[in-house]
């Protein structure tokens, strides 16, 4: 199981995604932990079982156990936070005086470099469409001194994974239906 298997499973109509996935996996401004953590966290965020299995297999070879768990933790906590803060934002400040009451300890103590965890959280927030979390994580990354190019590359990687997951899921559904 690997990114190569994932690329090979993509149908012809997803050729651009195949090329983009090849490109992001080998030519990037992200270091290895940033890249594989981003790929793993965003694969988990897509909820595509096949995409997650293939990326997770290779991510396990490229990340420490702590980074692997932190990337999955970023996807999980953002799954909650993105829904909460996106919804709170839609309600025009009517609930801003109320305490969230949500545990988010992993954000303060992720077990990896804070900037890497923030980067993964940003990429997942892009997939989940939460502008409030995107802005908050981007601001934290900039305060940590992370270059714009690194931030942009993580967003690009997450976008590629989201597109790949969509193509994989569509192809699997249509294949099962024999359409």
Curated annotation (Swiss-Prot):
Gene Ontology molecular function, alphabetical: alkyl hydroperoxide reductase activity; disulfide oxidoreductase activity; hydroperoxide reductase activity; peroxiredoxin activity
Gene: ahpD
Keyword Disulfide bond on entry: yes
Function text: Antioxidant protein with alkyl hydroperoxidase activity. Required for the reduction of the AhpC active site cysteine residues and for the regeneration of the AhpC enzyme activity.
Family membership: Belongs to the AhpD family.
Source species: Rhodococcus erythropolis (strain PR4 / NBRC 100887)
Protein name per its UniProtKB record: Alkyl hydroperoxide reductase AhpD
Chemical reaction(s) catalysed: N(6)-[(R)-dihydrolipoyl]-L-lysyl-[lipoyl-carrier protein] + a hydroperoxide = N(6)-[(R)-lipoyl]-L-lysyl-[lipoyl-carrier protein] + an alcohol + H2O
InterPro entries linked to this entry: AhpD, AhpD-like, AhpD_core, CMD-like
